[in-house]
Amino acid sequence: MLKDALRDYLDLYTECWEKEFGDPPMVDAEITEEPSICFVGEADDEGYIQWKYVEQPHPIDFGVIEDKYQIHVCEDVKQLYNSYLFLELQGFLDGQRVHFDPVTDETKDLFFPSDDAPPIDQYPHLVIIGLYGPMDVSLCVDIVTGKVYSWDLDPDTYEYEYEGRYKDPELIADSLTDLLTRLTPMKQ
């Protein structure tokens, strides 16, 4: 179950941060427009504030997305957004950096690249959930199957060679649960 894997990884991430830096994780206090319920204490002189993950108090209604796209959103994706709020979640998968987008009090919708870029509409169920690898390509999940992909959506990468065509996404995990259980907070 993704909620358990997410909680376990958030605990491990927090533990490693505290061991390395002596304090709970910190993020830029301006990561959200309004003060987050995840914030702990006050921002320091450099504008960083400690945070902790908390239970999601206002789950996203996936029925709207399911009706709009005529699909069934898989449980892993629903649980990623409806289990906990977190302001930072990153680690390493097979030596590559994985950085999830935060799930905050302000998270209300998912970003479908196919809504903005017609050349990639052959992947209508992929949503961006973060960044992957040294070049920060998009970390995407297929919201129907739950499979996790890396996908370079930077038009500059392919501008001349492919005239705006993107490479196909590359599978990196069979599910979000699989990804979270294989993720390590420190590079191995």
Predicted regions mapped to residue ranges:
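A surface-exposed partner-binding patch
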Residues: 1-137, 187
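Short, solvent-exposed coil/turn segments at beta-strand boundaries
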Residues: 122-124, 140-148
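A recognition module on extended beta-rich or small alphabeta surfaces enriched in W/G with H and D/E
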Residues: 139, 150-187
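Generic alpha-helical propensity signal that fires on short helical segments
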Residues: 87-91, 95, 145-147, 157-159, ...
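Short, flexible beta-strand-to-coil junctions
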Residues: 130-135, 142-145, 153-156
